[in-house]
């Protein structure tokens, strides 16, 4: 254990991945040979170094000054670019991010923020491989009628083909987090309506606002009740239906009929 391990900052969600086997598996989820890779929170550079063996460029975002200093000293590869910048403040719509893969062991406390940030510029990215909490991974891939089914499930599955690649034991990290993790992959779909993306994401949020109540309760407060009734008839939905009983395709159709 080095001084950076000992001084890992809980406030930044720092858990350094040291398991070489897991790192190699992450690097090989997608074929990143000669591809551009964006890394969020490179930490001490263990994953970064392996990515650089395959990728033609690795662009990393880090905000911890001590880690930035370490990375500058540790990695001299010309294909590596390190930015002292909060990823959540980056404009991902910029053309410079076109055709990147995102591969990262991210700070868990901002997982949803990171995902939604990428989702809002999904067309620039070829795919995502992220280390997340196991519980979050289960929410992302959850199907209807599951207790884990949520707006994150719908948003993720609407935009991408999602998969839990493998589970990672908490002891693969220094310091070890309290829970196990999972590596997820997302490959974005080609047929997504970019123009209505914000409206769609907001609709998912609205639908899950009162998940214990009938969905009509929420919809009638946000849409014309006649439109809601007609949409239900077209989809052959019961008035008693709750959001967790509808799959992604039904929710997307519901959005279409209401708009």
Curated annotation (Swiss-Prot):
Coiled-coil features, chain-numbered ranges: none
Enzyme class name: transferase
Alphabetized GO MF terms: 16S rRNA (adenine(1518)-N(6)/adenine(1519)-N(6))-dimethyltransferase activity; RNA binding
EC numbers, comma separated: 2.1.1.182
Protein source organism: Mycoplasmopsis synoviae (strain 53) (Mycoplasma synoviae)
Role noted for this protein: Specifically dimethylates two adjacent adenosines (A1518 and A1519) in the loop of a conserved hairpin near the 3'-end of 16S rRNA in the 30S particle. May play a critical role in biogenesis of 30S subunits.
Stored CDD domains: AdoMet_MTases (cd02440)
Pfam families documented for this protein: RrnaAD
Binding site for S-adenosyl-L-methionine: 15, 17, 41, 62, 86, 105
Alphabetic keyword roster: Cytoplasm, Methyltransferase, RNA-binding, rRNA processing, S-adenosyl-L-methionine, Transferase
Protein name: Ribosomal RNA small subunit methyltransferase A
Entry superkingdom: Bacteria
Disulfide bonds: none
Location(s) in or outside the cell: Cytoplasm
InterPro entries, sorted: KsgA/Erm, rRNA_Ade_diMease-like_C, rRNA_Ade_Mease_Trfase_CS, rRNA_Ade_methylase_Trfase_N, rRNA_adenine_dimethylase, SAM-dependent_MTases_sf
Taxonomic placement: Bacteria, Bacillati, Mycoplasmatota, Mycoplasmoidales, Metamycoplasmataceae
PANTHER family: DIMETHYLADENOSINE TRANSFERASE, DIMETHYLADENOSINE TRANSFERASE-RELATED
GO CC annotation: cytosol
Family: Belongs to the class I-like SAM-binding methyltransferase superfamily. rRNA adenine N(6)-methyltransferase family. RsmA subfamily.
Reaction catalysis annotation: adenosine(1518)/adenosine(1519) in 16S rRNA + 4 S-adenosyl-L-methionine = N(6)-dimethyladenosine(1518)/N(6)-dimethyladenosine(1519) in 16S rRNA + 4 S-adenosyl-L-homocysteine + 4 H(+)
């Amino acid at each position: 254990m080095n001084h950076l391990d000992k001084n890992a900052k809980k406030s930044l969600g720092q858990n350094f991945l040291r398991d070489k086997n897991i790192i190699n598996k992450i690097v090989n989820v997608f074929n990143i040979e000669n591809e551009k890779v964006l890394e969020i929170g490179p930490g001490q550079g263990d994953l970064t170094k392996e990515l650089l063996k395959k990728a033609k460029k690795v662009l990393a975002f880090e905000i911890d000054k001590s880690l930035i200093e370490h990375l500058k000293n540790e990695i001299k590869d010309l294909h590596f670019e390190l930015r002292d910048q909060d990823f959540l403040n980056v404009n991902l719509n910029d053309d410079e991010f076109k055709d990147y893969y995102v591969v990262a062991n991210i700070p868990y406390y901002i997982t949803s923020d990171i995902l939604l940030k990428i989702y809002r510029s999904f067309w620039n990215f070829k795919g995502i491989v992220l280390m997340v909490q196991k519980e979050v991974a289960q929410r992302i891939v959850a199907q209807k009628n599951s207790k884990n089914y949520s707006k994150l499930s719908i948003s993720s599955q609407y935009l991408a083909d999602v998969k839990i690649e493998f589970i990672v034991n908490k002891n693969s990290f220094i310091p070890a987090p309290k829970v196990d993790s999972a590596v997820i992959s997302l490959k974005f779909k080609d047929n997504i309506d970019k123009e209505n993306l914000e409206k769609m994401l907001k609709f998912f949020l609205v639908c899950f606002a009162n998940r214990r109540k009938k969905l009509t309760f929420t919809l009638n407060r946000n849409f014309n009740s006649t439109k809601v009734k007609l949409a239900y008839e077209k989809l052959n939905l019961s008035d008693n239906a709750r959001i967790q009983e509808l799959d992604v395709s039904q929710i997307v159709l519901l959005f279409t009929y209401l708009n």
